[in-house]
Amino acid sequence: MMMTEQQPFDLVRRYPGFDLRRYPSHTVAQIKVRASFDKAGNLAFRSLFGYISGQNRTNTSLAMTAPVVQAVTPEPVGRSSSAKDPGSQKVTMTAPVVQRPAGDDGFVVAFVLPASLTVDTAPVPTNPQVEIHTIPAGLAAAVSYSGGWSQSGFDKHSAQLHQAVLDAGLTLIGPPRFARFDPPFKPWFLRHNEVVQDVREPA
């Protein structure tokens, strides 16, 4: 399994300690899991990978896109899908996978879907726990690091990013997200990870 498409963004500026990026509106498949930070991604992966492997109303397989995202907001802001899907398709998975905390109920983990898909055209999941959402365009600070998917690693780089953003005179919005760009079988020391933090548009 390879993540053949990367989530697009425009590099606005490089600051000491982070990149400022502008992300376009994009579509995600997400699921909530009740687990620790370290276990949430692996628990969610099976259901989300099942969705892109054909567990949807059209039996469509999707290519995997990077990243997978795990982050800190109860719900994404944007539209969700209730559309009906007429037939079978093949879907690519995009990188990253995103993970964020979901209040006291664990974490939300999301696969970023290929840029060609919207909430109206993405296959409808057969698993009721998997939801399709549109995430609106926005400005974000991001820092990359290699290594495992531990909470300690995320917390360390999140704290560094937080301080760097404040030092740059920018305002943080909401909690940070954890973005994973590699499949679980890749050696931990070769994995590409990011912490992504929404920021307010400069005046």
Question: What is each PLM-predicted segment?
Answer:
Residues 1-203:
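A solvent-exposed interaction/effector surface
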